[in-house]
Every structure is written in structure tokens, then in C-alpha cells.
Amino acid sequence: MTDHSAARDAVTRLTRWADDFPQPGVRFADLTPVFSDADGFRVVVDALAACAPATEVIAAVDARGFLLGGGVARELGSGVVAVRKSGKLPPPVLSQSYTLEYGTATLEIPAGSIGLDGRSVLVVDDVLATGGTLDATARLVESAGARVIGIAVVLEIAALGGRERLGKYPLTSLVTV
């Protein structure tokens, strides 16, 4: 198993917590301070890249996953696809709706033009909460013909049960709270 201690230290030290955001009862993990710290960002990207060194494509989840996904793809020499929130891409798109801890949403990727068929994909995002977003992302890229070889996140909020929802996928979280 890869040692992620430098990444864990950076995330633990730099994460900003916001209670009752974006709505009452939700505790939001803001990783922006981790990303804005050059060393913190570097060790986090390196740790996420170590999760699946042979992946062909990174599926980066809108929006903070974009920051991580681009870095991980660059580190691995792989491609990256931005998994967008609904309405951000021109048609045709593939879409997947899901429930998250404070509402519902839909994710989209371009239909047919990004060549995912048969390719290995690592899904990357910042936080695992209920698992709705990551499950929808995995199902979405699978609907495009990709093989999801793993999911990697910076921070997992264990009490929200996301890991159980993602049980069929190998999952790495750098920090679990």
C-alpha cells in the first residue's frame, strides 16, 4: 500500500470546515486551502495518482474534481474528461441523475466524441459524502463504455455512508473523518 502520510498531513492541516453550508445541517469540507498551497496540492495529486498508475483516463467531477483530475492526469500521462453539471455542455450528451446529501442533480459528458469505449477510468473528486455524485459519475462513464478501475478522493466523511454505496469499486480516500 502506498504511503499517503504527506497528503494526509496537508489535508488535515489545511482543510477549512464550514457548518450549515450550503444549507442547515450540512458540514462542508472546503479543500480550497489545500489546493492553494503548492506543497499541499502537489502531495495530494501525487497520492491520488498512485491509486491507479495504469489508468488511461481520469474522470474529473465538477467542479473541484477538475483541479485534481487535471493534475492527476498530467502526473500519469493520461487523458482527462470533465464530468459536468447539467446544462454546461452542448448536445448530444450522456447524463446521469442522482440524489446527494442536500438535493438532486444531474451529471453529463459528451456523447460519443470522447472515446471512452473499453478504456480504463479512474474517477477523481475532492470529497466522498453520501456517494451519490461518485456513483453517478461511475455509472455515467460506464454508460459510455469505459471500465471504472477505481475511485479516488481526498476526503471521506465516513458517517454519511458513501463507501458502502460505492462498494463495487475500489476506493481510496486519503483522509477519512
Curated annotation (Swiss-Prot):
SUPFAM superfamilies: PRTase-like (SSF53271). It comes from Rhodococcus opacus (strain B4). Keywords: Cytoplasm, Glycosyltransferase, Purine salvage, Transferase. This is Adenine phosphoribosyltransferase. GO terms for biological process: adenine salvage; AMP salvage; purine ribonucleoside salvage. It holds the Pfam family Pribosyltran. Pathway: Purine metabolism; AMP biosynthesis via salvage pathway; AMP from adenine: step 1/1. The gene is apt. Catalyzes a salvage reaction resulting in the formation of AMP, that is energically less costly than de novo synthesis. Its main location: cytoplasm. Homodimer. Belongs to the purine/pyrimidine phosphoribosyltransferase family. It comes from the Bacteria. It is found in: Cytoplasm. The lineage of its organism: Bacteria, Bacillati, Actinomycetota, Actinomycetes, Mycobacteriales. InterPro entries: Ade_phspho_trans, PRibTrfase_dom, PRTase-like, UPRTase/APRTase. GO terms for cellular component: cytoplasm. It catalyses: AMP + diphosphate = 5-phospho-alpha-D-ribose 1-diphosphate + adenine. Its EC number is 2.4.2.7.
